[in-house]
């Protein structure tokens, strides 16, 4: 049976490190601070925000919440972002998305200063990921995949890594970050020919297709480490991933669970970015 790569121990280790770094910064008079910008009152946004506030509080990061009415104009939202950009006491900013359809999403993203883009949504942050330059921050979910692999001492240098999914949120940045660790990376998508055969070649398989149960036994072999980024609700109302866990567990060497895997680590990555920005 596979080793289950749970996110909880990774989170605990990251929280401990972030708390120590926060304490050191506060001794210098610096309080790491995150601005959270939310338009409207979607239940999932509110729930996620509560989780962020709790996680930040545990390590000593201050949170400033900017709650805007559902009917706020784009210019009013941009004014808030400009205010955050100009406030030296705010080190990072998280803008809840998706925004209402009337907004120019790209214009809003690019209004944020890359040095405060702790969620990795700006072109500047993407440039940093793809050029390995210290510009902005990687998308949190992509980095969470790497944090799990590093915590569990999964060797990457010289290994074959296959990433299934090419979004700018997970797939492409994860591929670049694996390449930075000297893995040989293949980036696939839903139209890749003979996808199962390519997946079976992987030593490390990262699945971020956004399709429930898309990867099963025909894509897997013994000795693999599988990172499942997907999160869905099945017919029974239970959370599940892009990988059919019941088929993967008896075959592979190690696999992340859903829930309890990548998703649990993402917020700690965000908090770590805020501390980095304050340092």
Question: Which role fits each region the language model picked out?
Answer:
Residues 1-30:
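Positively charged, low-complexity intrinsically disordered leader regions
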Residues 39-54, 127, 136-225, 234, ...:
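Glycine-rich phosphate/diphosphate-binding loop of Rossmann-like nucleotide-binding domains
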Residues 76-88:
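Short, well-structured alpha-helical segments in soluble
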């Amino acid at each position: 049976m596979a080793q289950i790569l749970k996110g909880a121990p990774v989170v605990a280790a990251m929280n401990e490190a972030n708390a120590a770094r926060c304490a050191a910064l506060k001794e210098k008079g610096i309080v790491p601070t995150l601005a959270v910008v939310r338009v409207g009152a979607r239940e999932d946004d509110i729930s996620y925000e509560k989780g962020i506030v709790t996680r930040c509080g545990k390590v000593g990061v201050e949170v400033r919440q900017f709650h805007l009415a559902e009917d706020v104009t784009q210019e009013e939202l941009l004014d808030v972002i400009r205010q955050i950009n100009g406030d030296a006491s705010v080190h990072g900013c998280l803008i809840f998305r998706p925004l209402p359809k009337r907004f120019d999403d790209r214009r809003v993203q690019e209004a944020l200063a890359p040095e405060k883009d702790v969620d990795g949504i700006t072109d500047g942050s993407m440039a940093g990921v793809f050029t390995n330059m210290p510009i902005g921050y990687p998308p949190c979910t992509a980095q969470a995949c790497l944090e799990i692999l590093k915590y569990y001492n999964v060797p990457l240098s010289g290994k074959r890594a296959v990433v299934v999914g090419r979004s700018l949120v997970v797939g492409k940045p994860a591929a670049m970050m694996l390449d930075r660790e000297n893995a040989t990376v293949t980036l696939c998508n839903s139209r890749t020919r003979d996808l199962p055969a390519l997946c079976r070649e992987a030593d490390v398989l990262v699945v971020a297709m956004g399709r429930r149960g898309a990867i099963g036994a025909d894509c897997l072999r013994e000795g693999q480490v599988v990172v499942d980024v997907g999160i869905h609700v099945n017919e029974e109302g239970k959370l599940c991933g892009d990988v059919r866990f019941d088929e993967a567990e008896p075959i592979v060497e190690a696999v992340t669970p859903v829930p309890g895997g990548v998703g649990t680590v993402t917020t700690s990555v965000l908090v770590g970015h805020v501390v980095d920005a304050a340092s």
